[in-house]
Amino acid sequence: MSILKLHAREIFDSRGNPTVEVDLYTNKGLFRAAVPSGASTGIYEALELRDNDKTRFLGKGVSKAVEHVNKTIAPALVNKKVNVVEQEKIDKLMLEMDGTENKSKFGANAILGVSLAVCKAGAAEKGVPLYRHIADLAGNEDVILPVPAFNVINGGSHAGNKLAMQEFMILPVGAENFKEAMRIGAEVYQNLKNVIKEKYGKDATNVGDEGGFAPNILENKEALELLKSAISKAGYTDKIVIGMDVAASEFYRDGKYDLDFKSPDDPSRYITPDQLSDLYKGFIKNYPVVSIEDPFDQHDWAAWKKFTASAGIQVVGDDLTVTNPRRITKAVEEKSCNCLLLKVNQIGSVTESLQACKLAQTNGWGVMVSHRSGETEDTFIADLVVGLCTGQIKTGAPCRSERLAKYNQILRIEEELGSKGRFAGRNFRNPRVN
């Protein structure tokens, strides 16, 4: 079934900034997709086209991207009469029309909006759930329910506190299924709220962009202590492990790192990559930290390689790899990390996201599907993580509706799968796919 009509508009993301939404019509009905947006972005990401008109939305409008869909992409796809199940063919058409390496002509936000809507329409055309259609596109016979990585303490560019490291996450790997993982996550979250309130006062329980708490603490170790205390109070010490997203590129200064980067600049407090690595190893030794994302700057290849070789945990590339096959290939060759963070808007199409995932998995890496800090109510990544069988997803705390929208969709998928549903659990890094 081909596309009858395609229409894009400006809507608002969870930070109140404009983003692109696309409506796609076939004989099966209307299929809608919205595009997310990040705060700490890797410099190698595909280009998110903003208007840069300072008189409108402080330059963050997306009317140009919307216009590219409505004036150029829509007529071309409608005229071509391509069947919506042909995801790769449609994505390739858009990439050829754009003609740039980083999608700077149309904007990755324009191309992705259409690509996501096409994928949803393709599932309906085949009469299967979206996760099943994605599994088919990826060549997976099985589907797997992921372990959620709840970002319950926010720092870095996601919060107005002094904390340098961006995310402190809990992963309920000991849960029996996704539903229980949600319960464990929610109970620890409520316990954490009480722990923070008792220690720092009620206003310390305000939440950051992703629904996690953002108490005004400076020491990263203090965040881990808060987690340890909340996990213990909830009674889940044996069922939860900890993950971190350091987003170290945000505080990289002249070959060193500034763990107090939100204060006035003072080079005397900068630490070396080796000192930072030792700090992480202390965390791994003293807390159940099993996953660290972006421990070093996106250009600090030597530090990544050294740490991954010696840390013995999951080391996740985000700013380093930006869901880009060329960057992933380099990271594989350099042995820089062992897990890919998969963000559809970093690369800008469903087909390329699937290729990035396959490339990582083929090389023995884990893959973690991820939201962005500026999100919408769109739930595409919930189906994506199940269909790609990656076994792990991070889409915020169990708080804020744009985060829960994804988790709730996975709950529905688990219910629908019934006895066929397999939960990744402790095998989240490398779930067995039949």
Swiss-Prot record:
MF terms (GO), sorted A to Z: magnesium ion binding; phosphopyruvate hydratase activity
Pfam families membership: Enolase_C, Enolase_N
Assigned GO CC terms: phosphopyruvate hydratase complex
Catalytic site positions: 210 (proton donor), 343 (proton acceptor)
Binding site for Mg(2+) 2: 245, 293, 318
Gene3D superfamilies linked to this entry: Enolase-like C-terminal domain (3.20.20.120), Enolase-like, N-terminal domain (3.30.390.10)
Source species, domain of life: Eukaryota
CDD domains, sorted: enolase
EC primary class: lyase
Assembly: Homodimer.
Family membership noted in the UniProt record: Belongs to the enolase family.
Protein's name in the database: Alpha-enolase
Organism: Sceloporus undulatus
